[in-house]
């Protein structure tokens, strides 16, 4: 990236809710991510080597889970893309709270990454937050970069 040019990042969130337990029809899993579009602002890499999004709210609930462990994962559909330019998705990480059940991590386009896990039911709707961070660099071409993230809440 040349001086005076900026790269903005937009991550689009998709939500998946899966139940794989043998009595899956009885399980009730709920997941909501807000906002659905996550924006990381642009800035001079010398003054801001790491760029952060506003906190993303993760609302989830697990019921009738028969004491099984639940798992929340995220995977990117590819690298960040702006026209012909790309930024490796592994340049994007997140800071999570509360810990537990949430944990910090780095995005991947090949392997779903664990965001949170816990035992049994989460009877009341519960909330966690994720703050996405981009390792900023002058090597990025100016542009608006986008990618889709798929969040999945599942039980074994």
Segments (PLM) and residue ranges:
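N-terminal small/polar-rich segments of proteins
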Residues: 24-156
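N-terminal secretory signal peptides that target proteins for export/translocation
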Residues: 1-4
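Bacterial N-terminal signal peptides
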Residues: 8-19
